[in-house]
UniProtKB/Swiss-Prot annotation:
It comes from the Archaea. GO terms for cellular component: ribonucleoprotein complex; ribosome. Pfam families: Ribosomal_L13e. One of its GO terms (biological process) is translation. This is Large ribosomal subunit protein eL13. Belongs to the eukaryotic ribosomal protein eL13 family.
Amino acid sequence: MEFPKALIKRPNYHFEYPHKRKDKRIGRGFSIGELEKAGLNINNARKLGIIVDIRRKSVHEENVEVLKKFLEQLPNQKS
């Protein structure tokens, strides 16, 4: 089973061409706010193998949806 990855916004650099810039990149982990909106706490997320980035303060709705889908798939994998 593949663990979910968090998406975050990329910083804008003035030396990059706009057509080569991507809007999002893979982040270090999920923020605490995203975990709380998905119904998890830090300890349970780490037990499940989800990486937590405690420095991030932003909450992206896409990441919350990814976490909810991941949690729905867990009982199906165990049975």
